[in-house]
Amino acid sequence: MAQTLSFNGRRRVRKFFGKIPEVAEMPNLIEVQKASYDQFLMVDEPQGGRPDEGLQAVFKSVFPIKDFSGASMLEFVSYEFEAPKFDVEECRQRDLTYAAPLKVTLRLIVFDIDEDTGAKSIKDIKEQNVYMGDMPLMTDNGTFIVNGTERVIVSQMHRSPGVFFDHDKGKSHSSGKLLFAARVIPYRGSWLDIEFDAKDIVHARIDRRRKIPVTSLLMALGMDGEEILDTFYTKSLYQRDGEGWRVPFQPDALKGQKALADLIDADTGEVVVEGGKKLTPRLLRQLQDKGLKALKATDDDLYGNYLAEDVVNFETGEIYLEAGDEIDEKTLPVILSAGFDEIPVLDIDHINIGAYIRNTLAADKNENRQDALFDIYRVMRPGEPPTMDSAEAMFNALFFDAERYDLSAVGRVKMNMRLDLDVPDTVRTLRKEDILAVVKMLVELRDGKGEIDDIDNLGNRRVRSVGELMENQYRLGLLRMERAIKERMSSIEIDTVMPQDLINAKPAAAAVREFFGSSQLSQFMDQVNPLSEITHKRRLSALGPGGLTRERAGFEVRDVHPTHYGRICPIETPEGPNIGLINSLATFARVNKYGFIESPYRKIVDGKVTSDVVYLSAMEEAKYHVAQANSVLDEDGSFSEEFVVCRHAGEVMLAPRDNINLMDVSPKQLVSVAAALIPFLENDDANRALMGSNMQRQAVPLLRAEAPFVGTGMEPVVARDSGAAIAARRGGIVDQVDATRIVIRATEDLDPSKSGVDIYRLQKFQRSNQNTCVNQRPLVTVGDVLNKGDIIADGPSTDLGDLALGRNALVAFMPWNGYNYEDSILLSERIVRDDVFTSIHIEEFEVMARDTKLGPEEITRDIPNVSEEALKNLDEAGIVYIGAEVQPGDILVGKITPKGESPMTPEEKLLRAIFGEKASDVRDTSMRMPPGTFGTVVEVRVFNRHGVEKDERAMAIEREEIERLAKDRDDEQAILDRNVYARLVDMLRGHVAVAGPKGFKKGTELSNAVISEYPRSQWWMFAIEDEKAQGEIEALRGQYDESKSRLEQRFMDKVEKVQRGDEMPPGVMKMVKVFVAVKRKIQPGDKMAGRHGNKGVVSRIVPIEDMPFLEDGTHVDVVLNPLGVPSRMNVGQILETHLGWACAGMGKKIGAMLDAYKAGADIQPLRDTIDSVIGSGPKGEPIKQYDDESIVRLAEQTRRGVSIATPVFDGAVEADVNEMLEQAGLKVTGQSTLYDGRTGETFDRQVTVGYIYMLKLNHLVDDKIHARSIGPYSLVTQQPLGGKAQFGGQRFGEMEVWALEAYGAAYTLQEMLTVKSDDVAGRTKVYEAIVRGDDTFEAGIPESFNVLVKEMRSLGLSVELENSKVDEVGASAQLPDAAE
């Protein structure tokens, strides 16, 4: 095969251990956020054709707004967004919100109302564009920038609207009887509960208020007693037959009962069944076949039945008995004497059909619709006298008014499914039929038919994403606005106003601002590393407004449910009080239009697995049999086994292969992104896997990122989708590269309206939300040819486009002098020396110069009483230089504040009067470095208010910025020129010119030589004979001029933004931000972890020569305690160690061959070795087709260690690990002989040594260590504050007091409780004594004692502290005899 392919070295090549082919493409990982918000804004939809959802639906639901008299109406026409004022980067730097102005077209219609007829005619129509505030936009990475910080709106899980049937699990009543209840939950509006009580009466509640009988609710809907009974029961007709009765034979009702007396055929009079015999279905069927129509009944059989209809005298209208009344010895003669010989009775046998509704009707005091409506009115508005109109209006508004009650499309779909209705999902209010269906189903449940709902099933919980949350919030804002508009429409002269005058957009804008600023679901983005960003955007929270609270959430809600499979990760959730309430979306899951989470499955057609993928929600999936992704298949795609393990209706079972309808698409579809990054997840205990996936999110980006030897194949996906690594937007050729930007000349997607140049600005040493460092590095070189989607730059924690959260470290599992006791970690000094775990952290300090009452503060170098030494890092403007090394206490920005005039003595006044004004007092309020922070200043930004004169520093920063913009413009212009002129030459060449620049002989055929005699700018003067070609040239010229002017315009806009002043908070004249970067090497006290929940704290860093070493002299980097493995059951780390060891061994082998090739050997052995490792398997590289140069590149990349991917649940098994160790020429045990670095002797037994991927977590000892001498005190108790942030002290708590008491250290204890804490006078005395060099002091009364006395007084106890004098003997004061 010809060696034609080349390998560019810009991606990491992995040996892939997965055996199951991936059928479905993994959806973009932040699709949840982007799709939802796009659907809400619908920016790209044409204005006329927007569907009624999102923002459009909000406007449609609030408008039109009519005034109270109906004389005018404000209609909504359409909305559009203008371009945002600042782009994302500018908003980040200036602390602004990235948003676009929303313009809404409104139409005001004024009517003429005829006073006599009341007919309306249109008098005037005005249309106008109205500004309705700014709407925040989402960045490409799925975040929002609010006041300069990146925020994420977390999706919320809540109970789906619809109807739910449940029971109390026998808790309410002592007998343990199940009380059933149904609840109709709308998206917004009143809840309706229908429930049984212990006496089997059915009640309804509205909004959890007082109960009313359900029959009252039905009466309010316009039904009467007879109609209610008719709806819920069937009836039988008893006909008088001589002395007895004739009753129809109903086999279904008699099934399973015993015949109490002989059953006699009413027509023939013969006994068909003898008394005491059981009525089996077979016997009943035989009777039916014989033609049995009716049975004989006696009066006794009739007693205890209930009338199905009113018994009425048709002539007089007198009602003898009502429907539902019981027939007994007293009532039967009444019916007979009135001359009725047919009695309809309800089919209630108290076994299959209970008399619940009839009993409720009997117990209900309300007789008619009016009573029922009044009753409901009294429940909803206690204390108000009801009238028929008000009661009817209120009842209609509760469930039947679309303004107040909205089931939403989801709610309607769920109701249809549960109640077997078929109502279009545009009907969003309740109907009478819905309420009847709910009551019917509830009664059936009580009769033992049907199942209750499981509220933790994902079919009954749905996700509200950004778009929907925002929609609800904006609707609230518009409703607030609506009230104001109505009032204004009524109060002003409507003929003269425009829509603009009616509208005050503040409430709408405030609602948006409030949502992004202070909602529980709007969170500060977790930006420690790319993985934590992605996980944050894919998080699902059950908390938040309208959700659960931590305290109320029980065990069931938090638990893993069978429907979570493939939708929500069972592993990744926080430890602690939020466990199970905050979840993560599974890798392949997506949210459908109704808000239910869907998971993909492969279809099975005629017993063969196809590549067709369908997405199903939990409700739809329940009816299928779903096989696992790792089921064994034959060549033709049918199942090998006769019985297949599958999931059906939440159970795992074995089913015949013909019954299987679907199959999972991938083994990793059940876990989240973070869990899918853990190799050998299948060998770890679930609790440790949870810690592992949570700790990967806390890994600090290191100075030199390194992709793991043992990965899972998810790494490139995370790096790409998180936006950390930059992918090319379209194919092209790299034109320029430096550390800060990449310029690419596009060769595909060339659109004349867009620029043909892509400029990618790289982020250099920017601060993330968590103070880690965001830095991007280019991977391409000039001239590289790129395809769309190629990675062109690495970001934080990425390495060649792979996620790289930590480093591969050589680990030995063995104890070492007790330094790895209790999960401690022992490190080699090499790790510090080679900056293996060094990270950069950036702190931001900001200082504002305000305008105070006494005059403006000033940022200056001229600070009173400060030595020149302290000012050495400041420039003439008083701001620190970039590159200055700063320490605690150093001045970053010099600032002085005017101080109030101190009162003057007469002498001073005299001197003032003679010598003129002395400069007013100022005090030094400079910003200094806080204690414990060292670093280098990496960036300074100066912001000035409009109209405030800029200082030197601000001007210099501005000049740099403009130069940078000019360079971008010039480069883009140069590429544009090059492209256009190259195309122009192609168009001109070979044509005969009829005109040209000065001195050109017309009629000459144009060639490259002829054209190049003239300067480029004159080439446009050539005119050629071919008119079509000449037309194309003209068009090119037009395009070129347009592009040029567009480029210039863009540049001018940007410059204008740089030069104009900044928006500042009120009273602020100037603001300076200083960014200080610090390199943090690893040190004892830092927390480290592997990917399997194996965490520990660095206990000691040992000199390299003292660390244990291998036979070839290599010292290990890390020593871990072997006891950390067995009890924790995270065996994955051991498999990773062995496999990592094999990878490194293989790398060494390849490295040796590469050196041999460079020394002149043949390349074939190297090619074969690489092919045997990476070329095999389903996703192998086409090594045989690579040219020699590519092979060398590959060998260089794999020299430190071959990278492999072992996907979760489908990865390498023990045999694969052994095979790989053998290939690398290592022992299959994975153990090695180790020598003690201090004595040089071998250790007693073989030790497991290998490579583990270790992470440094964002719990650094530098951020935690803290010391205080004097500092702030609490206002009330006068005790020192607590915590590092407040510069607080250490709490000397109850147990510590016991310890001192146990030692009998009375004086130490007294100091602790008084002068070292809250004895104010004593503190001062001690300080004075120390200053004097004296060591005597006296302890007084602690302030907290005074607080206690005050508390007791507030309870009405008169408590006073009496000082009894010390008597002559010198005995101590008596205890105060205080309580009177």
From Swiss-Prot:
Q: Which reaction does it catalyse?
A: RNA(n) + a ribonucleoside 5'-triphosphate = RNA(n+1) + diphosphate
Biological process (GO) annotations held by this record are: DNA-templated transcription
Q: Which GO terms describe its molecular function?
A: DNA binding; DNA-directed RNA polymerase activity; ribonucleoside binding
UniProt keyword GTP-binding, yes or no = no
Q: Name one GO cellular component term.
A: DNA-directed RNA polymerase complex
Enzyme nomenclature, EC number = 2.7.7.6
Q: Which InterPro entries has this protein been placed in? A: DNA-dir_RNA_pol_bsu_ext_1_sf (IPR042107), DNA-dir_RNA_pol_bsu_external_1 (IPR019462), DNA-dir_RNA_pol_su2 (IPR015712), DNA-dir_RNAP_su2_dom (IPR007120), DNA-dir_RNAP_su2_hyb_sf (IPR037033), RNA_pol_bsu_bac (IPR010243), RNA_pol_bsu_CS (IPR007121), RNA_pol_bsu_protrusion (IPR007644)
- Superkingdom assignment: Bacteria
Give the matching SUPFAM superfamilies. Answer: beta and beta-prime subunits of DNA dependent RNA-polymerase
What keywords are annotated for this sequence in UniProt? DNA-directed RNA polymerase, Nucleotidyltransferase, Transcription, Transferase
Function of the protein: DNA-dependent RNA polymerase catalyzes the transcription of DNA into RNA using the four ribonucleoside triphosphates as substrates.
Q: Which family does it belong to?
A: Belongs to the RNA polymerase beta chain family.
Q: What quaternary arrangement does the UniProt entry report?
A: The RNAP catalytic core consists of 2 alpha, 1 beta, 1 beta' and 1 omega subunit. When a sigma factor is associated with the core the holoenzyme is formed, which can initiate transcription.
Family annotation (HAMAP family) = RNApol_bact_RpoB (MF_01321)
Question: PANTHER family from the entry?
Answer: DNA-DIRECTED RNA POLYMERASE I SUBUNIT 2
Name of this protein: DNA-directed RNA polymerase subunit beta
Organism taxonomic ancestry: Bacteria, Pseudomonadati, Pseudomonadota, Alphaproteobacteria, Hyphomicrobiales
